[in-house]
């Protein structure tokens, strides 16, 4: 046992380097524009193409939620610090990725719609286009929030404790709404309970 511990200690630095490199590569890959499911073009049937588009939209939703988390981090980071600048740069990059993903997914769906598609299939395309537009709108809102934080910094505005608590509460509620959105996007069939949960969360946010 002592020998095993000594060996582990000897290799600790190597483990750290490997893990750090893997995390860094994963982090870097995620922040480059790339479509995971529809990059290879149309599949043999429209139904399969729609399935791939659905997966891509689900991934789009996850990326947008990650962007929202960055905005929360930005608000709690010391303004003007190096970390603050890095987070803002990441948000800016994600916003550009979000815009490109919307365009690419929409172009793919329109291509699917031009093919042989059933009535139900056309309804699915219409719904997916709406989803894509709404997710892109969330990305835009995240970027606008980040810009507001920058303007707050430039104007040297300070929030009191009450305002900060209200902001944290709003972030919590919206984060829960995004959690539910992504759960729905991952499902093949949406239940009425999912819709009710989303509706109730929206009411909670608005109130």
Segments predicted by a language model, with ranges:
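Cytosolic, long alpha-helical scaffolding segments
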Residues: 2-207
């Amino acid at each position: 046992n002592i020998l095993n511990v000594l060996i582990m200690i000897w290799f600790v630095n190597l483990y750290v380097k490997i893990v750090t490199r893997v995390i860094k590569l994963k982090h870097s890959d995620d922040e480059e524009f790339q479509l995971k499911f529809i990059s290879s073009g149309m599949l043999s049937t429209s139904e399969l193409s729609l399935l791939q588009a659905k997966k891509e939209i689900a991934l789009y939703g996850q990326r947008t939620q990650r962007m929202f988390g960055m905005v929360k981090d930005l608000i709690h980071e010391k303004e003007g610090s190096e970390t603050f600048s890095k987070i803002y740069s990441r948000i800016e990059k994600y916003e550009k990725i979000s815009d490109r993903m919307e365009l690419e997914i929409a172009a793919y769906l329109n291509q699917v719609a031009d093919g042989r598609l059933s009535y139900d299939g056309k309804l699915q395309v219409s719904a997916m286009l709406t989803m894509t537009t709404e997710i892109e709108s969330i990305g835009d809102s995240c970027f606008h929030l980040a810009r507001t934080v920058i303007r707050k910094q430039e104007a040297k505005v300070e929030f009191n404790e009450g305002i900060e608590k209200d902001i944290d509460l709003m972030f919590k509620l919206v984060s829960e709404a995004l959690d539910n959105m992504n759960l729905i996007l991952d499902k093949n069939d949406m239940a009425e309970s999912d819709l009710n949960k989303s509706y109730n969360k929206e009411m909670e946010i608005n109130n």
